[in-house]
Amino acid sequence: MIAEIICVGTELLLGDILNSNAQFLAKQLANLGIAHYYQTVVGDNPDRIKQVLAIATDRSQILIFTGGLGPTPDDLTVATIADFFETPLIERPEIIEDITKKFARRGRIMTASNRKQALIPQGANILPNPIGTAPGIIWQPVQNITIMTFPGVPTEMKSMWQETAIPYMQSQGWCEQTIYSRTLKFWGITESSLAEKVAPFLEKENPTVAPYANYGEVKLRISARATSLELANKLIIPVEEEIKDIAGIDFYGINDESLASVVGKLLLESGETLAVAESCTGGSLGSMLTSIPGSSEYFYGGVISYENQVKITLLDVNLEDLMAEGSVSHVVAKQMASGVVKKLGTNWGISITGIAGPGGGSDTKPVGLVYIGIARYDDIVESFEYRFSNLRDRNWIRRVSVSTALDLLRRKLYLSKQRPQHHQA
């Protein structure tokens, strides 16, 4: 069986909203082991929806629609599908009853326009919506074609998918084998370099190993097709362990682990604490750290020293060094890191100062130049220079700077685990 995702909505075509439904469904189909080769976005236009249907029914057997199930005139998905298959719409009283109850729970009366949502093709099964008023359908209008419709609201779509669609597909025998995946994450190595190191694994068929990169992070997805998670892990884990050995310290986490969560785990294990001093990243590093539940146990806080006087007043950065070297320099990065350690009384301090652009660069200090400082309570202070000039985008430079700073600390913490610890008294 081949599935196809069709997302209906002019707002998607215009880029007004992100098409997160397609991403979710694509991952779900892969996990279920259902082949999926095509995705289409089409506006709220009956003729164009029919054109998409004509193409999709010729190449796929499971057509998954999202969007266009609401009560407004431009919500045309179900009516257009029914018209395409020359099938009448029937008002279903159980849908009317469900919508009426949902309105009553909010102290309201169902509007006349909502009756439209109770119209579904004759012979179609109702796909209940436990959250909203728009039900979906599961329908086999002709042999070898199954239509599923979901609302465009992601929370509603996901709930209906999990509670009804997956059990239905499993009951049809479409998911005899499932694809199980684990994603290994790396920082400090390029996608091409990692691919070269693990080249023999990229040729495997079960499990498959696929590299991809985003915002400087490289990932390897190891996927195995099997009838159970236990059998899949027997295929995946040996490959995973070999790749981790090859990558060494460039490997940092699995699946949902982030650099911030890994750093937090290492700090908890060592009983150490952290503070940050930020300039060009404007608090992004602190935000990343505090996004981890329980981070107050090791993260004390930070200073956003965007203006030079703040660097001097709050972080004890030397005015003469600022005048001589500039705020974007090794010496200032070091003083920011050591300053925040002393001010907040932590074991570790990280600083970031740089030129995120789009303006402010020069021949000697171009946009993308970033210095990251790392200080320890025992006065060991280092700084590292990075040139992210190839990114040429302010948000990218800031984001990569934060991740690079976290990775630097991760490596320091990992190496310090290998030798005896001497904590601050």
From Swiss-Prot:
Organism: Trichodesmium erythraeum (strain IMS101)
Full protein name: CinA-like protein
Family: Belongs to the CinA family.
Family annotation (HAMAP family): CinA_B
Domain of life (superkingdom): Bacteria
CDD domains named among the record's database cross-references: cinA
Entry-linked InterPro entries: CinA, CinA-like_C, CinA_C, CinA_KH, Competence-induced_CinA, MoaB/Mog-like_dom_sf, MoaB/Mog_dom
Pfam families: CinA, CinA_KH, MoCF_biosynth
